[in-house]
């Protein structure tokens, strides 16, 4: 059985190489500088389960510096003001970061915008008013989103979710319960 001879397109290789250089210069040193934070899980989280103030500040810093370098929003659709690079660049970028940083250095998770907590195609579905209010700070890495899917008794089974959103004349009324909200 023969292998498929295929090479990454030059533009994707250039993005990958630039991203790796960025991570070596900006992300790995931040992780090393804050090693004490990562070596003790009690320093990562507050008693209520949220990120500690120190970790939150570090994540915010990584997001901002990555946005300034053009990597944070490189795969966000052009219609939302992003770089418009496709899925191939997105996944090649993630793979490169995981290979370089490994699972122990998860600050790299905040280098490229993630659909659940950064500017993404989800913003194509919100009102123009909401997009105008939220998009610019997200593209600059100054704000992020959160994502709440999991519910008691349903977990992440979208078909079993009980939370409802109903128009109430002034907007929407949400009823239900969520657990494990990502990036809250």
Regions found by a protein language model. Give the residues of each.
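Amphipathic, small/basic residue-rich leader segments at the start of a protein or domain
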Residues: 1-111, 129-133, 137
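Short, well-ordered beta-strand elements within core beta-sheets of diverse protein domains
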Residues: 5-7, 119-126
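Short, solvent-exposed polar/charged micro-motifs at secondary-structure junctions
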Residues: 43-45, 85, 118, 156-159
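Glycine-rich, Trp-frequent "lid" loop and neighboring beta-strands that shape
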Residues: 82-83, 122-184
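Short, conserved phosphate-binding/catalytic loop or strand-edge motifs used
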Residues: 111-118
């Amino acid at each position: 059985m023969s292998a498929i001879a295929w090479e990454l397109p030059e533009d994707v290789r250039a993005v990958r190489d630039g991203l790796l250089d960025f991570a070596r210069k900006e992300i790995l040193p931040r992780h090393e500088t804050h090693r004490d934070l990562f070596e003790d899980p009690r320093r990562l989280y507050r008693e209520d389960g949220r990120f500690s103030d120190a970790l939150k500040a570090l994540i915010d810093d990584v997001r901002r510096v990555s946005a300034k370098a053009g990597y944070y929003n490189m795969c966000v659709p052009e219609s939302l003001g992003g770089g418009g690079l496709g899925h191939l660049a997105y996944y090649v970028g993630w793979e490169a970061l995981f290979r370089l940083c490994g699972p122990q250095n998860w600050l790299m998770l905040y280098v490229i915008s993630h659909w659940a907590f950064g500017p993404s195609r989800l913003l194509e579905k919100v009102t123009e008013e909401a997009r105008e209010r939220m998009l610019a700070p997200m593209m600059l890495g100054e704000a992020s989103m959160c994502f709440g899917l999991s519910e008691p008794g349903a977990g992440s089974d979208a078909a079993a979710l009980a939370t409802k959103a109903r128009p109430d004349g002034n907007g929407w009324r949400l009823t239900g319960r969520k657990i494990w909200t990502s990036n809250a």
